[in-house]
Amino acid sequence: MTLPDRLGGWKVKRFNKLGGNLAGPSGAVKSDGHLTRFNRHRKTATEERGQVAVGMKAVAVKAGVSLATVSNVLNHPDIVAPSTRRRVQRAIDALGFVRNESARQLRAGRSRFIGLLMLDIGNPFFTDVALGAEQAAEEAGYAVVLCDSRQDLEREGRYLALLEEQRVEGILLSPVAVSGTRLDQIRRRGTPVVLVDRRSRSRGECFVAVDDVLGGDIAVSHLLDGGHQRLAFVGGSFDIRQVQDRYEGAVAALVRAGRRQDELAVITTALLTLECGQRAGRQIADLPRTRRPTAAFCANDLLALGLLQEMTRRGVRVPQDLAIVGYDDIAFAAGAAVPLSSVRQPRAELGRTAAQLLLEEARAPEQHRHRRVVFKPELVVRASSARAVTGHRKNAAS
């Protein structure tokens, strides 16, 4: 035997010259040539972790207090003397007690979780929104259950049903499409819903959003100020309200400048992703130079970055041949090969404000008044549209 069967507790899988396995004492092994450590005692997972759950009664006995005192330490620690809290906590730590949240939730009819259902958590914009919401929830003693609809209406519906079944304290929703009837039904059954990054005409709900019509307007106004004659809007699907609003703002800027709506070429994408931006870039690059737009406003930064990548690959210079403006001002925008001009949204503040409104309604519905919070966007000008305007920010409020 040229190799020991064991090296420091590791079983060595040995192979013959034909690539077959040499089975060790433990039986057959795979022929992938890696080392596998074996548990000599061969306990099951259940045996390793044990099966006996410690209850509150055991904690009370060990701490020398009543069951009610343990309950107060867990649920209302502010009314328990610090010395008693410490004694109960020592008993909890010694026994390894973990309270049954499901049972507590069943008794109370409420939970310490809020649902957060986003359009696309792979988009850094929604990641930042989620971070803001999570921070506000944590400060209030809640945790966040994060769900991703992937811009799919049926998937969104399944998650809404699941979150309601789990009796979350409330739902933060960035919807694919607003269904007033469905959301009204959820609210009537006792689960508050706050819309995030989406405006609503209903006065019976809270929402937190950005003025996307204004955002589209300032983006295209910026490009028109630079003398661009052939403009394109890149975005989709138009089922998503944010895309509609940003396009509407772009058209408003064009018409105000004395141009026709049909002078804004529309390149529709299936999704708001980097890959869709690259495909849009191929469409633009394949056009004859005399018909190719000289500026593009993209419905979000991922589309804009994908477009920028494809332009670079095809030898179309940005901004000399094509100026590009995105939307969201995600962290990657400033660090792109050609730093990307973008309409900035207060991403984390959107999430934080929405979570605060949701928890306010959930904890004191009889005092809550629905509010609409609309932030103003801001155009951040960088090199990708520098031919138009350079060296400053054009604030939407001006």
Model-predicted regions and their roles:
Residues R167-P175, A232-G235, I267, R289-N300, ...:
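Periplasmic-binding protein-like
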Residues L7-F113, H392-S398:
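N-terminal helix-turn-helix DNA-binding module of bacterial transcription factors
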Residues E101, M118-D128, L146-R155, T181, ...:
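Hinge/beta->alpha junction and helix N-cap segments in small-molecule ligand-binding domains
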Residues Q229-L231, Q261-A265, R317-I324:
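Short acidic capping loops at alpha-helix termini that bridge into adjacent secondary structure
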Residues P82, F97-G170, E248-V251:
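Amphipathic helical "hinge" segments at domain boundaries
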Residues A28, R282-S398:
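Flexible loop/turn connectors
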Residues L67-N72, L106-G122, H222, R230-S237:
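Short beta-strand segments enriched in small/hydrophobic residues
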Residues K13-N16, A23, A28, G157-L214:
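Short beta-strand-centered segments that line the small-molecule binding cleft or hinge
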